[in-house]
Amino acid sequence: MTITAVKIITCVFVFLIGSAIGSFLNVVIYRTPLKQSIIREPSHCFSCGNRLKWYDMFPIFSWLILRGKCRFCGSGISPRYMVMEALCAVSYLGAYLVYGFSWEFAVACVLFAVLIVLSGIDIDHFEIPYWCSITVAVLGIAAFFIPWGASLAAPWYERLISLGVVAVMFVILVLIGGMGGGDLQLMVGASLLLGYRIFPALFIGIVLGAVYGITKKIRDHKAELELTEKIRQIALDWYQEQLDADVGYVLAGRDDVIVGTITGGKPDIEWEFLDENAWKGIPDKSSLSRAIREQITTEREGAFRITIREDQITRVKYSRRMVFGPFLAIGIATSFLFGSQIVNWYVGLMNLS
């Protein structure tokens, strides 16, 4: 058997293993946020409840053969499952082609699996699980002590400097509302693993996220204005009822803010943000939540902010939630495979100029 044939067979093997792991990651993405076991409960159709046969669970191929439908009831199966399986397979194959069977390849397999899981959960639930960020950080800390290959070798001070710079940048972004705490934890953990290569990852993630965010903002602008106006009118009517009822809401010249969220199509008010002294006269605080929930039906995930000044609602602002974890994950994965080449290319470009 020639070397080329062995290489091809090995690539096919790595691809199939990656797709099988991707199938398991689909289970992790769906069940862990719901606190369900990822082992005990067998795979089944969400529509009819029938347990899937073993020949219906071949990664990628079963979805294609079944044409994205359940064998028993014909209900549609989201193509996302196949996409995740293919994504894991391709990422594992890419890691093998870059690093071969090495320590770097082993680290890449763990890292890419974690990145796929956190991306899926972030898309579904707008949060990056703490354990995902911790896993990435553990890989980085292990790099301090384990003599891995040259691609993972970096002085300890380089990793710490990268960590410090990234932490400061992301703390600022979190404080101004540009990113969430999960994004900060992820990039801090990744900086321990990547060292100076975290900066290409950061650049790629921010650029992709910005392009996605701007595109989505332009596309959804009209719908967001309509939703904001609905919330404003409901809040005005509710607040006027409180004033007419003389329930004792007195700001005494102070400002107050009502913060609400829309999660899974269900609007709610985060009352812990309110001034308790100002609002203690209202016997039923949940009346505003009920009013918004009864009159607004939307699948949009977002947050709204109602500003009250001198007994008047002066501003209502709605902003749609945007996931950022998947874009950071793309940046981290790309930088893990090609970060050194990207940095060297950029340095060479600067020298030429």
Task: Show which residues each predicted segment covers.
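A membrane-topology feature that recognizes alpha-helical transmembrane segments
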Residues: 1-353
